[in-house]
Amino acid sequence: MASDRQNLQDAFLNHVRKTKVPVTIFLINGVKLQGVITWFDNFCVLLRRDGQSQLVYKHAISTIMPAQPISLYEGEDSN
């Protein structure tokens, strides 16, 4: 069933959250944030760095770049 399949955004965010991979988040105004994603929902991401948490609204995010390569769908086509 197609609705059982997780969307790419949720799969990506869940993977970096579970594995605690550090990320760099670029906002649409050019600001660069770095840290570990500890939580997310449909509207925002919680980013933690040096014991501080930042609530970042998804509509302000341009790009999320993990600090290391990640593999989301092992064994599947790269399509």
From Swiss-Prot:
Annotated ranges, domain Sm: 10-70
GO molecular function: RNA binding
Entries under InterPro entries matching the protein: Hfq (IPR005001), LSM_dom_sf (IPR010920), Sm (IPR047575)
Gene Ontology CC, one term: cytosol
Keywords: RNA-binding, Stress response
Any matching Pfam family: Hfq
Entry-linked PROSITE patterns: SM
CDD domains named among the record's database cross-references: Hfq
UniProt record, GO biological process: regulation of DNA-templated transcription; regulation of RNA stability; regulation of translation, ncRNA-mediated
Subunit: Homohexamer.
NCBIfam families per UniProt: Hfq, PRK00395.1
Family matches, as HAMAP family: Hfq (MF_00436)
Role: RNA chaperone that binds small regulatory RNA (sRNAs) and mRNAs to facilitate mRNA translational regulation in response to envelope stress, environmental stress and changes in metabolite concentrations. Also binds with high specificity to tRNAs.
UniProt family annotation: Belongs to the Hfq family.
Official protein name in the record: RNA-binding protein Hfq
UniProt source species: Ruegeria sp. (strain TM1040) (Silicibacter sp.)
Source species taxonomy: Bacteria, Pseudomonadati, Pseudomonadota, Alphaproteobacteria, Rhodobacterales
Gene name per UniProt: hfq
